[in-house]
Amino acid sequence: MKKINEIFYSLQGEGYHTGIPAIFVRFSGCNMKCSFCDTLHEDGIMMSDEEIISEVVKYPASMVVLTGGEPGLWIDESLVDALHNEGKYVCVETNGTCVLPGNVDWVTCSPKEGGEVRLNHIDEVKIVYVGQDVSVYLDLPARYYFIPVSYTHLRAHETSLHL
């Protein structure tokens, strides 16, 4: 059983897959406490893999994004295999502190200050920039970097981002 906050259909709004239709499976719970997080971590219902798949197949997208909270606390190879069996391309959005199953198709790591990244393979790094030193993330084993800038933070502090 896995604690699910919500399952919904939308377009991927950021990163490498921006604009692609996707089914989002938002897991509850996280091992980090970020002030800017938009997930209600305690909300959700316990669902089996079969119940998750039953909801996912109601939507037309071939891409599934496992997000959170922290999906690494919940996902396993059997869930990813079940999604693959339904013809789904499986993406995970993670803070990188949990080892992920090896059968995930795309890994987006959004590292957080104070969290040790434990991933050997990362397709994309997404850094939520709120004024921190992002150079510490440039050595992560990633193919792509995506840095959404917090406009309100930049305005408030008149800061510019230099990489």
Regions found by a protein language model. Give the residues of each.
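Glycine-centered loop/turn positions within well-structured domains
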Residues: 32, 161
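Radical SAM/AdoMet-radical enzyme domain recognition
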Residues: 76-144
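Conserved small/polar residues in nucleotide/adenosyl-binding loops
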Residues: 152-159
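Conserved Radical SAM active-site core
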Residues: 2-9, 21-22, 33-104
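Residues immediately within or flanking Cys/His clusters that coordinate Zn2+
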Residues: 27, 31
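A short beta-strand-turn-helix
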Residues: 13-15
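Acidic, proline/serine/threonine- and glycine-rich low-complexity intrinsically disordered segments
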Residues: 148-150
